[in-house]
């Protein structure tokens, strides 16, 4: 009986109320801007990544044993929409064409240094300055894409909101 009482005392101690959290300075509720605010992949909500930040992500990719790969797409076909998607019926449920971007060269198998990837990003930017470019990581054992993020938005991208205009 004494052990049951000891257990109930320890349960009471674990259910104490947490201290109240202070409200942020700007406590107004905001709404996400639904017009011209397309987001791509993982880090789209952040400002554009610098080469140093891209390099850190490549380190993460390499340390996990994944293969980095660059892909690019024209703004008109980079995002699946009713205007540019070809819906294939009967082949597989829910399949939409235009989900896949053009690959820049081959996947970088055996890549061990972020500078190798950054050189390829730079070469792709020179060759295609007005396209979206994303870096994706593939796990060749599981045969899946594990990660993907934009490394370039077109300079004239109209479907993108700056950070300060994303919420109203």
Curated annotation (Swiss-Prot):
Family the UniProt entry places it in: Belongs to the RuBisCO small chain family.
Gene giving rise to this polypeptide: RBCS
UniProt main location, coarse: plastid
Taxonomy, superkingdom: Eukaryota
Name assigned to this protein: Ribulose bisphosphate carboxylase small subunit, chloroplastic
Assigned keywords, A-Z: Calvin cycle, Carbon dioxide fixation, Chloroplast, Photorespiration, Photosynthesis, Plastid, Transit peptide
Organism: Chlamydomonas moewusii (Chlamydomonas eugametos)
SMART domains membership: RuBisCO_small
GO MF annotations in UniProt: ribulose-bisphosphate carboxylase activity
Localization (cell): Plastid, Chloroplast
Free-text function comment from the UniProt entry: RuBisCO catalyzes two reactions: the carboxylation of D-ribulose 1,5-bisphosphate, the primary event in carbon dioxide fixation, as well as the oxidative fragmentation of the pentose substrate. Both reactions occur simultaneously and in competition at the same active site. Although the small subunit is not catalytic it is essential for maximal activity.
Record has rRNA processing as a keyword: no
Summary of subunit composition and partner proteins: Heterohexadecamer of 8 large and 8 small subunits.
Gene Ontology annotations of biological process type: photorespiration; reductive pentose-phosphate cycle
SUPFAM superfamilies named in the record: RuBisCO, small subunit (SSF55239)
Extra information: The basic functional RuBisCO is composed of a large chain homodimer in a 'head-to-tail' conformation. In form I RuBisCO this homodimer is arranged in a barrel-like tetramer with the small subunits forming a tetrameric 'cap' on each end of the 'barrel'.
Gene Ontology CC entries for this record: chloroplast
Transit peptide: first to last position: 1-28
């Amino acid at each position: 009986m004494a052990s049951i009482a000891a257990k109930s005392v320890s349960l009471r101690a674990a259910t104490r109320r947490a201290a109240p959290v202070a409200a942020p300075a700007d406590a107004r509720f905001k709404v996400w801007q639904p017009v011209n605010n397309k987001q791509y992949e993982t880090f789209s909500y952040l400002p554009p990544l610098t080469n140093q930040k891209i390099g850190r992500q490549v380190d993460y990719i390499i340390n996990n044993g994944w293969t980095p790969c660059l892909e690019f797409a024209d703004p008109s076909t980079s995002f699946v929409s009713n205007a540019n998607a070809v819906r294939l019926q009967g082949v597989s449920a829910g399949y939409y064409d235009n989900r896949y971007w053009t690959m820049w060269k081959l996947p970088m198998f055996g890549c061990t240094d972020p500078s190798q990837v950054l050189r390829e990003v730079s070469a792709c930017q020179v060759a295609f300055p007005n396209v979206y470019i994303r870096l994706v990581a593939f796990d060749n054992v599981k045969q899946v894409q594990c990660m993907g993020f934009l490394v370039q938005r077109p300079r004239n991208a109209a479907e993108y909101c700056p950070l300060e205009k994303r919420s109203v």
